[in-house]
């Protein structure tokens, strides 16, 4: 296929798509150029159906450092494991694509996005999402797209599509919305306490922009799209399905309605084990035994799925007996752990999260070196999901994509209420340990994080709570669920997480299994979520009404001073000599930023005070008319040099030592003497002149006698006009210093 180029303008930037030139052996490939960002997307599909009971879709987003003209860090100087941002972007692309494959599709599909050129003002992640959909759409892979996504900002009351870097820094909203031309199917957002009305407006305007991108894709697909391949879908034997439903559906219905999670799981598993045993015996010698038993497992899963959904949509009964808008029992505990800087335990039904706070000097911030300019990350929220939380064994090791994603969601939700660096100059780390899980553990971690921050004395603007909303839809009717549990998440159509304060939303995340949801459903879900959020905040605020006024005794104490930028080198010293000496002498930690903010950390307040005193002395400047207790450090014929403080000396000229005339400096002061001096002049080169006599009382003028004549005074001897006295010279150097 020959190279073809398609071009349009979107959100004020040129959008160019090239096909037929590179990666031609993939099922589908495109090069997307948005502004000066360039992304190559290649989509491939396996020839045969994969084994397993899930759709093996893999989406990668690969950041090549050359795209930004940078060398990779580390010893190897080569790209390694994906960064956190790359992992989150891959998830962002995966989520709207996954629902667009047919039920029962089991062929492995890989979508690889490679960033070849990076323009920070033209979103490479959105170009990659566009490219992923387009590569699948023009390929022969059975994909029911296209989809597209955009970033949405909110600046000065205006909604902006795909904001520039400068606009993004000013924005109160960081929203990504994706969907089909008919509906939204993915949302990811952080926001600075925006109302439900503004969030809904941003979502709908974002979807309007999505439609523009989809229309452009449809134009390209019409020109270069391949005919879709016919692939085998996973189907179960209809007769076998009818037989099992007739015999065991009533047993499974009873098991599904057991309210307690572990008991319900045991009851449903008992029914499944019974059915499996019957058919293993019945078809033990059948040549298609493996296929039949796979069908049996799939039929039982479908029966449970259908019954859970029927109970909710028809009977309005949830598996645990709650109403559709009812939250599970709540419990909040603070100070769960000693020694740590703050801790909170939050429980919602059978979902429980422990959050632990650690405060550290700003030197512990995380350095992020990706395609964007390097920056320091002050706040980290890490989420751990051990298998024991669901009563199972499983893999332990580095966090997976799900844990990274849930940690990032909590981070966005809580970051919006953190104090500024000037208000609270600490690096902040929260770790959420999920101890039990029956759905919505990410939102429990947000609630526990709020407890830990407030307990630890971090002056957050307001408490944050999170809730997960669900959806059961049969196409004609739908039911929105508040606080979904694991079974409702697994068999439902939507997982819509909403976090915020009483004043507004701080984070959103929505994933759906159907091809999209309407504005009506979004509106209802946001309204129910607000009501639930307030109920949870009631519990949090009853447990800890306000942020504690002091940090934990084990937390590092901190003091800050501001110095002139040109004084930074004085505090650091040659090769760090001065600052290292201060640290060694006092035992503190010291951080200095480029703006001259000096942060001093220690568990010992006296050590902080001593270090602060030393630094203040190093950067102290003499001022005219100020008085100092100074020490004589050098004597010259023309005066004495005195040390005002630290490395700052001044000259006291011999004429400024006393009101009476003297010819010898040594007659008045000696090296080591301490004298009071007043600064009388600082020249343009910073040289300081001081005076001792300015602090002494001025002697009275000579008195007159009664006749008005001056009192007698010693007469200077007269010299003969031919006799010239020997002239005395006083050395006055050109530069007194």
UniProtKB/Swiss-Prot annotation:
**GO CC term (a single one):** cytosol
Catalysis: reaction(s): RNA(n+1) + phosphate = RNA(n) + a ribonucleoside 5'-diphosphate
List of residues binding Mg(2+): 489, 495
Q: Report the locations given in the UniProt record.
A: Cytoplasm
Its chief place of residence is cytoplasm
- What class does this enzyme belong to in the EC scheme? transferase
Q: Which UniProt keywords apply?
A: Cytoplasm, Magnesium, Metal-binding, Nucleotidyltransferase, RNA-binding, Transferase
- What cofactors does this protein use? Mg(2+)
Q: Where is the composition biased (Basic and acidic residues)?
A: 700-714, 725-737
GO biological process annotations for this chain's record?
Answer: mRNA catabolic process; RNA processing
GO terms for MF: 3'-5'-RNA exonuclease activity; magnesium ion binding; polyribonucleotide nucleotidyltransferase activity; RNA binding
Q: Where is the KH domain?
A: 556-615
User: Which stretches does the entry tag as region Disordered?
Assistant: 691-737
Biased composition regions of type Basic residues, renumbered to the chain? 715-724
Q: Which PANTHER family match?
A: POLYRIBONUCLEOTIDE NUCLEOTIDYLTRANSFERASE, POLYRIBONUCLEOTIDE NUCLEOTIDYLTRANSFERASE 1, MITOCHONDRIAL
Under the heading HAMAP family, the entry gives: PNPase (MF_01595)
Protein name per its UniProtKB record? Polyribonucleotide nucleotidyltransferase
What gene does the UniProt entry assign to this protein?
Answer: pnp
